[in-house]
Amino acid sequence: LVALFLWLGFWQLDRAAQKQQAAIEQKSRSGEGRLRLSGEALEAESARYREVVVAGQFVEGSQFLLDNRKHKRVAGYHVMAPMHIEGSERAVLVNRGWVAQGKSRAEVPFIALPTGLLQLEGVVRVPVSQGFRLEQQPAAAVRLYLDLQQISQMIGLELLPFVVRQQSEVENSGVGDGLIRAWKLESRDSDPAMHYG
């Protein structure tokens, strides 16, 4: 039993160190200047935490909600949509922001998807591998996890191997979308992993 608790303590300390490293990397990358996504192949690690600008069109009928996302302890979803990058045969998955869950799980919020040629700014995030999964996830309006390969097959375009967390309102859309984009910066000061370790 003691060995288990020791292992858990070291595991928590390792998680805290990983989060500290991510915070340092994120701060250093934010000073590198904005990268324009042109549809060229990009490695996930070379783009991680970079500020980007992307122009293109959201792929019609492909928006979905990523379940089990909280904002200020309120249950909700991240609104995800692939954007076909202008002048290319590639797309990038955009995390458009957070929306609260309805009064019940059966009430799925409707979020309009902007149409036409658009431009937005964001920060690159690399999705965490999900490891073991019980079954293939159906192509549905609400998903439990990201599967970039499945989304790529669904839309018929190659997806860049990362997600852009949208920071700005979409230019040229004419309306605000009401989504919350209060993305947390990785923080070493408030990391519970350090306290548990």
Feature roles, as predicted:
Residues 1-45, 49-197:
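Surface-exposed, charge/polar-rich loops and edge strands
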